[in-house]
Amino acid sequence: MAKLILLRHFKSQWNLENRFTGWVDVSLMKVDFEIPTLDFDIVYTSPLIRNLHTVLEVFEKKDKYPIFRHFKGKMKNWAHFEELNQNYIPVFVSEALNERHYGKLQGLNKEETMKKYGKKKVHLWRRSYNLVPPGGESLADVVKRATPFYKKYIEKDLRSGKNVLIVASHNSARAIIKYVEKVSDRDIINVEMPFGGLLQYEFNKGIYKLLKNF
C-alpha cells in the first residue's frame, strides 16, 4: 500500500496578473500561507521554475534535502549520486508534466485575449477537451503526454510501495486526476484545482482511493 500526493504549484506573478502562462517560466510570488508537512519518498515535477520553487518550499518542512534528477540529456549523463548519503529524496524532472502550452496566447492578459479573439472562442479554447489555441495544445494533448509518463514511472513507484509527491501545474494535474479517478473527457473540463491545492490518494493493488482533499 502506498500514497499518491498531488499538489498544484503556488501562485505566480502572472497568475496574479491573469495572464496565460503555459510554458513561460515565471517565478512564484511570496508564499504567505502554511504549507502542510507531507510524507513522501520520491517527487515528480516539471522543469518550470514555479513548480521547482514549490518543491523547495515543501522541503522546508522536511529533514531531508532534494536531489534533482533528469530523464534525458547531459543532466542525466552527468549525474552521479552513488557517493551521497541517504539523507536526500530524489526529485525527478520531466517536461511530460509541463503545463498546457497556450501557444500565441502565452503572456496575454485573459481580458485582452477575449477582446482580440472574442469571448466565445477564448472560452472554448480554455474549457473544451480537444480544441487547440493558435500554436498551442488542447487538454487532450496534455493527457496524451502526461498519462503514459505517469503509468511508466510514477505508478511503477507506487506499485513498489513508495509514497509519491507530484508537484504539477493545473492541466497536468487534471490529466493525472482524469487517469486516477477515471474521469470522462466530458467531465474533466469542469474539474478545477486551486493554487496550492492538494489531493491525497491511497494506492492498493492498482486501485486509487481519495483520502484527503485540501
Describe the predicted segments one by one:
Residues 2-82, 86, 116, 120-123, ...:
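Active-site-proximal alpha-helix that buttresses catalytic centers in soluble enzyme cores
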Residues 130:
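Active-site rim beta-loop-alpha module in soluble metabolic enzymes
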Residues 7, 94-96, 211-213:
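Conserved beta-strand termini and adjacent loop/short-helix elements that scaffold enzyme active sites
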Residues 13, 50-52, 99-100, 172-174:
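Short, active-site-adjacent cap segments at secondary-structure transitions
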Residues 10, 45-48, 96, 127, ...:
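Short, well-ordered beta-to-alpha junction loops that form the rim of enzyme active sites
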Residues 78-117, 122, 126, 203:
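Signature for phosphate-centric chemistry
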Residues 16-17, 103, 177:
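Short, function-defining helix-loop hinge/capping sites that tune catalysis or transport
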Residues 4, 52-53, 59-67, 148-209:
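Active-site-adjacent alpha-helix immediately C-terminal to a catalytic or transition-state-stabilizing loop
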